[in-house]
Amino acid sequence: MEADNEQKLESAEADTQAVAVPAATPVSVDIRRTLTRLLRKRVKKFVALAPQVRADANPKVIHDLRVWSRRLQQAVSAFFRKPRSSKVRRLRRTPRRIRRALGEWRNCDVLLEIVARQQRRTRSDDKRRAWEFVRNYLLPRRAKEVARAGKKLLRQDVADYAALAHKLLSQPADENPEVLMQRLRDSVEGAWNDWQAALTRAQETRAVRELHRFRIATKVLRYRTELLYDVSYTQMKAELKWLAELQDAIGVWHDRQVLYQAVARAVAREDVLLNELPTARILLAELESDRKHESVDVEKIFRLASERPGHLPLVPTPSPLT
């Protein structure tokens, strides 16, 4: 599922070229410089986080590295136009590979946190033991994902990556800043259109697959909007706040889906059904009870989606260079 979602996220990146190229303006030149500085900062943050990934790493480190890899990849995609050179493609590909390598590791960390919360909430010893059963199922799975990710991360030289980024960003600009500005605006407008289409399908079908697609569309929209905001389009602050709230609500729903799948896999084994039937019954009952909240989660998502702030024209806010 994670790999499929990543592929959808990659394919969502639009390649739009301006038909007529106007002369560069002070605002467009300023935005190009701002984006260059922003890209350097994101490279620095990404390179600083990557070495902190260890088997005993705080789950927040894994989460933060995945977030910053998306931010970095989005900035690279926006800054370098297509067709991209092999070096630029590598600059874009490395954070994507690291993020994918950490996907299941991150899922296990989230699930273990949910299981611990379930154990703290219940007063029933039987339920506590049942959730401990799920925890014992998840721990070796996490260890396997940590080992798998570790092997993949060893193949990524972040120091070399930082040097490559510095070299590419130090090259003279070969593109009119106005074209870059238009590409940034078009990418956000395209994401809005894709988001609206995904929302319509999710509302019409209520299908889990379509809700997952809407989740990805929301993620794409948020990262593109965030990038535009960071390069002086400050009128998008309200939209960013709304997107963060919407993504949090979708995240709650998504975590439940991942939990349901993990519990189902944990109990749907022959030895469990033969030797741990009382535990399986308790977990299935817990699952059935929890799924009653699923429709409430979905309706909350659609309600938040309908509360989108007014979509203002994409006009940069002039600001002095700092």
Residue ranges and their predicted role:
Residues M1-T322:
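Function-determining surface determinants
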